[in-house]
Amino acid sequence: MTSQERIKCALRHEEPDHIPIHDSPWEATINRWKREGLPDNIPVEEYFGYEIVLIGFDPTPRFPIKTLKKTNAFIIQTTSTGATNKNFRDYSTTPELIDRPIKKKKDWPPIKERLYPDYTRVDWVSAFNTYQTARSEGKFIVCSGGWGYDGLQGYMRSDQLLMAMVSDPDWVKDMILTSANLHLKMMEMMIEKGLKFDGAFFFNDMGYRSGLLFSPQTYRKTHKEADEMVYSFCHKHNMPIILHSCGCVKEIIPDLIEIGLDCLQPLEVKAGMDVRELKREYEDKLSFMGGIDVRAMANPDPHVIEEEIRSKFEVAKKGGGYIYHSDHSIPKNVSFKQYKRVIELVKKYGKY
């Protein structure tokens, strides 16, 4: 089977030849692996056989990016959302948030007027080169993007945003719908230009270690209409939807299923997202991607990661509906040798 066939099969809750494989190592992790033997001339996704190719566009207000300060350890930059962040030079951690452009409701309209669909939001040469290569290799090609709470953190401090979601949900809903509409129009434009996607991969972190960052009721007031609108568009174009949402998001899974979500990712283990429990509870109502603990990957005892993969694959792969991925992304404390072992085990226990 090709990757395209394999993933389509899994998302239909049918059993392919083996579990599809995809993952997300950090840039700092890849740099470490190159020092430990990953060939410089082979992209990591090619070396390990990742099966999903993402093609996106710029969904931001496109403010200029400026470097304000650079040291041997840190870099302070503005972003295309108008924010200012401080990062380690290797971008190996979540950035420190220094400033955000929206502090009050009056700050939103000047940003909103910049969020319009435009052909220049897509790097067409790169997009078509990526698309044609991926299509020739039989990959599963998705349109990527994201709107909602996670994206809005690029405009507002998290605490201010969370308070606004409760005190003025209609305003937050307007911000989310504005971004969702931009995504819909841009996908429409890309499809009309010849990018025939196999699916969609959207990002919106809504959880943390202990649960949702906001209540299911707040999700329904602020997010649900926008999510359903874009999901409906995707389904009309035969594009199953994978949603990346970190943390524990169990409480809104029924809402996500109701509006048409096909697959939930990444299933953070430390947040209580156990793929075995989720698979047993939702069966063929939802597919799952991820759930393999990166802490087990970094454990010096090789039996730990083997048991992690064996025990979870045993349940998750039955009847299809599962794609391998780490339970978030691969940090730099996982060695090249350890990760090669991970993929060996995925192939061993992922056979049908």
Q: What residue ranges belong to the model's regions?
A:
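Active-site loop segments of alpha/beta catalytic cores
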Residues: 1-36, 76-78, 105, 109-352
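Compositionally biased, low-structure terminal segments
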Residues: 48-49, 64, 89, 129, ...
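Short, solvent-exposed loop/edge-beta patches enriched in aromatic
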Residues: 15, 46-53, 69-71, 137
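Short active-site-adjacent helix-start/loop capping segments
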Residues: 29-32, 62-65, 85-87, 151-152
